[in-house]
């Protein structure tokens, strides 16, 4: 009887503990164990392709993948393949004839919620001199340019250093792994002209002129007391000169007779 009585007391306690553990396990910040993680950790990837040919005819192949992460600020990560021995030799041959090294990415939107029915809308291409890439030991900087809606509208690539100086490079040591810095550049909003303060200042000046009508008078209305005497003086002086000239002319004519 004693073991049965003890068991009857223990079972309710175990059931209560089990119930508490079950409720605590479901409390996961409003997200169940089967739900997806936050959108800040979700994303998508697009291929990064490159082409370097001696005949300068682009034939793109996979270089790596751009992995985009959603969130307040678009972030991008790049995973790249190593160059094979054949690719290293081809790249050096292209550099020897001053050929071009090209890259391209599809034109997509960086907004994760727009990737459900994503379709590529063409490609964006950039290039650099192959000799500059070789002499930089595959060190390049790739920048993706987006518009205000988040679509990729441009891509640029530069090497460090960016010039060709004819330096010999050991392909097995320096031409195997890319050293790439990649970033996303969004458009910068231009400063808005301060039209409101200008209009307010103009209205204040108009109000001041309305309160002081003396400032609204014309030039003649302000200085007529000086202009009129001057005009009369000039008129009188001109009349005196004409009368004096006529008298002198008559005397001269009379003396001639």
Swiss-Prot record:
Membrane side Cytoplasmic: residue ranges: 240-257
Protein name: ER membrane protein complex subunit 10
Protein source organism: Danio rerio
Gene Ontology CC, one term: EMC complex
Major localization class: endoplasmic reticulum
Topology in the lipid bilayer: Single-pass type I membrane protein
Assembly and binders: Component of the ER membrane protein complex (EMC).
The organism's taxonomic lineage, starting at the top: Eukaryota, Metazoa, Chordata, Craniata, Vertebrata
Gene: emc10
Transmembrane regions: 219-239
A single GO BP: tail-anchored membrane protein insertion into ER membrane
Location(s) in or outside the cell: Endoplasmic reticulum membrane
Record's signal peptide: 1-23
UniProt KW keywords: Endoplasmic reticulum, Membrane, Signal, Transmembrane, Transmembrane helix
Family: Belongs to the EMC10 family.
Pfam families: ECM10
């Amino acid at each position: 009887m004693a073991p049965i009585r003890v068991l009857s007391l223990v079972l309710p306690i175990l059931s209560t503990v089990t119930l508490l553990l079950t409720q605590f396990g479901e409390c996961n910040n409003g997200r169940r164990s089967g739900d997806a993680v936050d959108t800040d950790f979700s994303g998508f990837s697009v291929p990064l392709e490159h082409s370097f040919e001696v005949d300068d005819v682009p034939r793109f192949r996979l270089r790596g993948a751009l992995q985009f992460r959603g969130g307040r600020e678009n972030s991008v990560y790049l995973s790249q393949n190593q160059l094979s021995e054949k690719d290293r030799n081809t790249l050096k041959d292209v550099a020897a004839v001053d050929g071009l090294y090209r890259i391209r990415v599809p034109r997509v939107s960086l907004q994760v919620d727009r990737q459900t029915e994503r379709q590529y809308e063409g490609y964006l291409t950039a290039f650099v001199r192959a000799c500059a890439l070789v002499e930089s030991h595959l060190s390049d900087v790739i920048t993706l340019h987006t518009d205000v809606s988040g679509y990729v509208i441009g891509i640029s690539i530069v090497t460090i250093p960016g010039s060709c100086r004819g330096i010999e490079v050991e392909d097995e040591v320096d031409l195997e792994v890319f050293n790439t810095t990649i970033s996303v550049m969004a458009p910068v909003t231009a400063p808005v002209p301060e039209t409101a303060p200008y209009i307010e200042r103009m209205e204040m000046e108009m109000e001041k002129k309305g309160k002081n009508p003396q400032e609204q008078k014309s030039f003649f209305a302000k200085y007529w007391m000086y202009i009129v005497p001057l005009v009369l003086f000039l008129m009188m002086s001109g009349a005196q000169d004409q009368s004096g000239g006529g008298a002198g002319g008559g005397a001269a004519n009379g003396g001639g007779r």
